UniProtKB/Swiss-Prot annotation:
Keywords of this entry: Cell inner membrane, Cell membrane, Membrane, Multifunctional enzyme, NAD, Quinone, Translocase, Transport, Ubiquinone
Gene: nuoC
Region called NADH dehydrogenase I subunit C, residue ranges: 1-172
Any single GO CC term annotated in Swiss-Prot or TrEMBL for this entry: NADH dehydrogenase complex
Family to which this protein belongs: In the N-terminal section; belongs to the complex I 30 kDa subunit family. In the C-terminal section; belongs to the complex I 49 kDa subunit family.
Reaction catalyzed: a quinone + NADH + 5 H(+)(in) = a quinol + NAD(+) + 4 H(+)(out)
NCBIfam families assigned to the protein according to its UniProt record, in alphabetical order: NuoD, PRK06075.1, PRK11742.1
Quaternary structure and partners: NDH-1 is composed of 13 different subunits. Subunits NuoB, CD, E, F, and G constitute the peripheral sector of the complex.
This protein's record includes keyword Cell membrane: yes
InterPro entries with a match to the protein in the record: NADH_DH_suCD (IPR023062), NADH_Q_OxRdtase_suD (IPR001135), NADH_quin_OxRdtase_su_C/D-like (IPR037232), NADH_UbQ_OxRdtase_30kDa_su (IPR001268), NADH_UbQ_OxRdtase_49kDa_CS (IPR014029), NDH1_su_D/H (IPR022885), NiFe-Hase_large (IPR029014)
Protein known as: NADH-quinone oxidoreductase subunit C/D
Pfam family, one: Complex1_30kDa
Function: NDH-1 shuttles electrons from NADH, via FMN and iron-sulfur (Fe-S) centers, to quinones in the respiratory chain. The immediate electron acceptor for the enzyme in this species is believed to be ubiquinone. Couples the redox reaction to proton translocation (for every two electrons transferred, four hydrogen ions are translocated across the cytoplasmic membrane), and thus conserves the redox energy in a proton gradient.
Length: 581
């Protein structure tokens, strides 16, 4: 069934509740539906349609009140967009619902897609959208006492535009009291079988939480009866920043959404921007992008490997693996000029070409790693204590993973070989030979094994990049390539003007909506961009994998011991900047 057939099927099934299809540059349909039909349409697409859309990838809000280019779209003050995926079809569909701008209200779809709950809370937090039947209508990224909804167009985008903030002693006490672990507020039980449960704050300063993040637990002894993750302590307003930076100037921020992913965070953003511009990136630049992305995958997975061993009682491996990471970062630094956040990619290509001798450095790293990985297998994967702490712990199957929006190694550990690099190749990944490691049990052990095997596959991909690096330009010959090639600046007045405008004002993208999807170190990262014909984004939506992965804790943790929760958190491999943005 084609995308057109699917839209026709929805129209036949729901009649005038389907308002029509929006014209976009996407490879998937975007369909507007009436608010009252939202739950029914989502339920149909998940449970009734042939080869159903089992995963809610993302749900977000758009403030349409200042938008100038909305041709062909129904009236809407606040729009709710939901992005669904069918792995069986290898296809997506986006649904949109138009709401009133002053008092936006919509029906919750958390009863259809469980992972919608946090996305709906975020839409309330940032835009003020009330969702009927939402089980926890709480703020999620902002503190409980926050006033207003900062992603609305009427809200300021800079601290200097807000009143002076003064943290008085009374205000500090009030904010501290608001963060108390109130079981009623978090929807936690206080008794089981007539026995009072202990309410425990797990974090936000525990080393086991891997960042500023807490879980409020209801415990019967050491057994977890219920768990409620509490996030937002690391929120920095990345999506709001995108609205006041030019398309070019926002690039360094993408490195810091997942601060361990490096250049990989730049890829989905640039995909969407380059699609909007109609830019074809040269082969050399595409191959360099692949090579550096896989280098950062290895850097991340080595950190995961070492800290996972440390979380389960092995102290030595993490020190050995930091030696390997230092070698890798020296290669990255030699090529890009920086280590963790290079900002190396550009709209249309790269910031600069590969330096002389780059291939020798990369080959030395490739030759170094295999023996090290073999040593670590004995230290960690074949270690009886590690196996006892991880096998059968925090296990879930593919169906549950899809219900909660799990992607990346967490999904592949259940036996699903879904990987964007294979299913929807980008940046030339279709030209590389590599396997997709999968597990079978979906437990902590399999999630570790999958990431270790991914290191080996990344080494294989990088070696192919070195052996087959194309020659040619590193930037596209396109007027919106930013910044334009400097060597052409003084040829004539036209090229000089293009360079001046590109370097100072930045490119102006045509109005429209585009999406970029990449298999980052933690799973599917998606940037959904709206251009209104300005030098800056009208709306930048950043879908990160860590956000739904933490939401799933409330479904997986009950029944396990507190010590098992440590192993489970380590096996998720989340980064709080990736969660809170």
């Amino acid at each position: 069934m084609s995308a057109t057939d699917l839209v026709s099927e929805l129209g036949a099934r729901f009649g005038d509740a389907v308002l029509g299809e929006q014209t976009t540059r996407e490879r998937f349909p975007t369909v507007w539906i009436r608010p009252e039909a939202s739950a029914a349409v989502h339920r149909y697409l998940k449970h009734e349609v042939e080869r159903p859309f089992r995963m809610l990838v993302d749900l977000w809000a758009i403030d349409e009140t200042a938008r100038k280019h909305r041709e062909g779209q129904p009236p809407s003050g606040i729009t709710i967009a939901s992005h669904l995926m069918s792995h069986e079809r290898n296809a997506d569909i986006r649904l949109k619902v138009g709401l009133d701008a002053e008092y936006p209200s919509a029906k919750s779809i958390a009863g259809v897609y469980p992972n919608a709950a946090w996305y709906e809370r975020e839409a309330y937090d940032m835009f003020g959208v009330e969702f009927e039947a939402q089980p926890h209508s709480l703020r999620i990224l902002l503190p409980p006492g926050w006033e207003g909804h900062p992603m609305r167009k009427t809200q300021p985008g800079r601290a200097t535009e807000r009143p002076l903030f003064n943290m008085t002693a009374a205000l500090f006490d009030a904010k501290e009291h608001a963060l108390a672990a109130d079981p009623e507020k978090f929807g936690l039980p206080t008794h089981r079988d007539g026995v009072e449960l202990m309410i425990l704050n797990y974090g936000p300063h525990s080393m086991a939480t891997h960042g500023v993040f807490r879980i409020v637990l209801a415990l019967d002894g050491e057994e977890i009866v219920a768990a409620r993750p509490d996030i937002g302590f690391h929120h920095r307003g990345a999506e709001k920043m995108a609205e006041r930076q030019t398309w070019h100037n926002f690039l360094p921020y993408t490195d810091r959404v997942d601060y361990l992913g490096g250049v990989m965070g730049e890829m989905p953003y640039l995909q969407a921007v380059e699609k909007a511009c109609g830019i074809t990136v040269p082969d050399r630049a595409l191959t360099v992008r692949v090579m550096l992305s896989e280098m950062f995958r290895i850097m991340n997975h080595l950190l995961f490997y070492g800290t996972m061993a440390q979380d389960t009682g092995a102290m030595s491996p993490v020190f050995y693996m930091f030696v390997d990471r230092e070698r890798g970062y020296r290669v990255i630094e030699a090529i890009t000029g920086a280590r963790m956040h290079p900002g190396y990619f550009r709209i249309g290509g790269l910031s600069m070409d590969l330096p002389q001798g780059w291939d020798r450095l990369v080959r030395e790293f490739l030759d170094w790693m295999p023996a090290r990985l073999a040593d670590y297998e004995g230290m960690v994967l074949r270690n009886e204590i590690f196996q006892a702490r991880t096998k059968g712990v925090a296990a879930y199957d593919t169906a549950m993973a899809l219900d909660w929006g799990v992607t990346g190694p967490g999904l592949r550990a259940t036996g699903s070989a879904w990987d964007v690099r294979k299913a929807r190749p980008y940046s030339g990944f279709e030209n590389f030979e590599f396997e997709i490691p999968v597990g079978h049990n979906g437990d902590c052990y399999d999630r570790t094994v999958v990431r270790v095997e991914e290191i080996r596959q990344s080494l294989k991909i990088i070696r192919q990049c070195v052996d087959n690096m194309p020659s040619g330009p590193i930037k596209a010959d396109h007027p919106l390539t930013t910044p334009p090639p400097r060597e052409r600046m003084l040829h004539d007045i036209e090229t000089m003007i293009h360079h001046f405008v590109g370097a100072s004002w930045g490119p102006v993208l045509p109005p429209g909506e585009t999406t970029g999807q990449v298999e980052t170190v933690r799973g599917l990262t998606q940037f959904a961009l709206i251009s209104d014909g300005e030098p800056s984004s009208y709306r930048t939506r950043i879908r990160t994998p860590s956000f739904p992965h933490l939401q799933m804790i409330s479904a997986v943790a009950p029944g396990m011991m507190v010590a098992d929760l440590v192993a489970y958190l380590g096996s998720i491999d989340y980064v709080m900047s990736d969660v809170d943005r």
